[in-house]
Amino acid sequence: MSAEKQKYGVHSEAGKLRKVMVCAPGLAHKRLTPSNCDELLFDDVIWVDQAKRDHFDFVTKMRERGVDVLEMHNLLTDIVQNKEALKWILDRKITPDTVGVGLTNEVRSWLEGLEPRHLAEFLIGGVAGQDLPQSEGADVVKMYNDYLGHSSFILPPLPNTQFTRDTTCWIYGGVTLNPMYWPARRQETLLTTAIYKFHKEFTEADFQVWYGDPDKDHGNATLEGGDVMPIGNGIVLIGMGERTSRQAIGQLAQNLFAKGAVKEVIVAGLPKSRAAMHLDTVFSFCDRDLVTVFPEVVKEIVPFIIRPDESKPYGMDVRRINKSFIEVVGEQLGVQLRVVETGGNSFAAEREQWDDGNNVVAIEPGVVIGYDRNTYTNTLLRKAGIEVITISAGELGRGRGGGHCMTCPIVRDPINY
């Protein structure tokens, strides 16, 4: 008799974190330059060797607290040794639409000949003209390099894989495969989907796919995991702002209600700004009843509640709530939320929010990991009884994401409310 499959799912924002996926800095970050970092959604180039050391420290601190940490390069290295998985990935990544008619066979043949670890690096790190040996389609490659230059990308790098939170999100007993807002990030979802589809870590687990398909054009329906928080009591918070659209929220809510996965969705209508690109950049849970927030943005959030209701069009009742967002979240959980605001005077608070002071990840109730540079906010959290474990922000933070952004929780315990 076969063993029962392990159940995967995330049932709170601050319960004990059991399993998480991360992606260490690597080749993709070595491709960042002052001339291309804006296009690749980084604010600056980074010192990659130091970033790798700092990320290793981050992973080590999670493992020391009992978290099973999966790393994306390692997962891809495993699955590309499976011919079916490799074909599935390359059929989607190496096409006339992505690399051009003249290079499709050449790039694919070269990638198929790489060692698994190197192949995984290039799937995330991208392929530049200079990477291809002249023996592969020599005439075409030479023309490409002569015209566009050796440093131009045949396949663009994916440095934002560092922020594994966004490409997929685990909501109670299932996962979403997110259609990302920016074209620069959409290939990330394809790679993560391949991992879920082919890696034994997931093929031997029990979970559902709630929404999303990397083979489909979702149009204006965009969803990113930094906006999604399953907080318990059958409630999920979803930020609606720069990166996550009402079109995606409506479809996801319908699917979750149809499967009985949640009882309500609280939508946080965010102002559209770079500083508030996701809900988790201004609001995150540190304990069952404590949140850290950037008040300048959170006070502007317009809350809506969506509930299943077959008597209404599309089977949902949608209502705007004339209360503060924090009030609404606390009431629906049945607790009085304690609030720790971004620390310091107005200048310091704006700087610390920009440096991800509110973007902490809870690894168990009352214990979070955050960046060391946010000294005012970290001090206030500690005064409120939160254990703050710090990691270096100098390099990892240049892509505008903290501990919450750099983790994709896969298994997290519920919290009783």
From Swiss-Prot:
Pathway field: Amino-acid degradation; L-arginine degradation via ADI pathway; carbamoyl phosphate from L-arginine: step 1/2
Disulfide bond sites: none
Enzymatic reactions: L-arginine + H2O = L-citrulline + NH4(+)
Signal peptide: none
Localization per Swiss-Prot or TrEMBL: Cytoplasm
Pfam family, one: ADI
Example GO BP: arginine deiminase pathway
UniProt keywords, alphabetically: Arginine metabolism, Cytoplasm, Hydrolase
EC number: 3.5.3.6
Main location (coarse class): cytoplasm
Cellular compartments per GO CC: cytoplasm
InterPro entries: Arg_deiminase
Record keyword Hydrolase present: yes
Active site: C405
GO molecular function: arginine deiminase activity
HAMAP family: Arg_deiminase
Family: Belongs to the arginine deiminase family.
Designated name of the protein: Arginine deiminase
Species this protein is from: Pseudomonas putida (strain ATCC 47054 / DSM 6125 / CFBP 8728 / NCIMB 11950 / KT2440)
